[in-house]
């Protein structure tokens, strides 16, 4: 369990509790979680973070009424900046989106502006929102992570408790390489409910070559680890930066959806540009 799992900042969350579903607009349903909870223990300060990035959300269950009462549906794309004070707690996000269901809006842009305003207020940071009509996305191909998949290794694993031990001496030689590694075996668990979170991860770096077996063992050790998606990605980034000391590093995870939402955080210290096309499990 993470050291801050019982922090008072988490006590008021609806996550893990029985809740009523409202279908009329209510911005107060949104709840934020301070990013400092997992940054402070590592000595990471908001004015001197070793990375940049965003939390990319896809909203698959978004519906409201137009001015005449006719239901509208859209797919939403949200990007929440890494500098925001809070991340958005996903169950509260789902409950908030449900509150749009029987609410009338004059037009699509009013919905977009409402989402952007409320999410920015909750996160205390920069948020951008785009809404897509279904016919804009129909026929869109399933994407994939570019890079070398490290999953097909003939190794024995019998320990699934999180540890950074595998990253000790995980680099070798003096030759500098530039490569992109991919794994679909990332599984962590919700910080509060301990429900499983399934994801694929892409690690792009320039530096001394990272031992792929040790890296895979490290990623598999998240299997019993309890943290939010965004926190796991930052943990992986910082662990790799600390132990492997690459010149450039980017870590990008795309998680499967839950409650009509998927979360796709990325962190980088280079000019990394993430692909936003959904993967096969999304």
UniProtKB/Swiss-Prot annotation:
The primary location reported for this protein is cytoplasm
Q: Which residues cross the membrane?
A: none
Name the pathway.
Answer: tRNA modification; tRNA-queuosine biosynthesis
A Pfam short name: QueF_N
Q: Enumerate the InterPro entries for this protein.
A: GTP-CH-I_C/QueF, NADPH_dep_7-cyano-7-deazaG_red, QueF, QueF_N, QueF_type2
What role does this protein play?
Catalyzes the NADPH-dependent reduction of 7-cyano-7-deazaguanine (preQ0) to 7-aminomethyl-7-deazaguanine (preQ1).
Q: What is this protein called?
A: NADPH-dependent 7-cyano-7-deazaguanine reductase
Q: Which gene encodes it?
A: queF
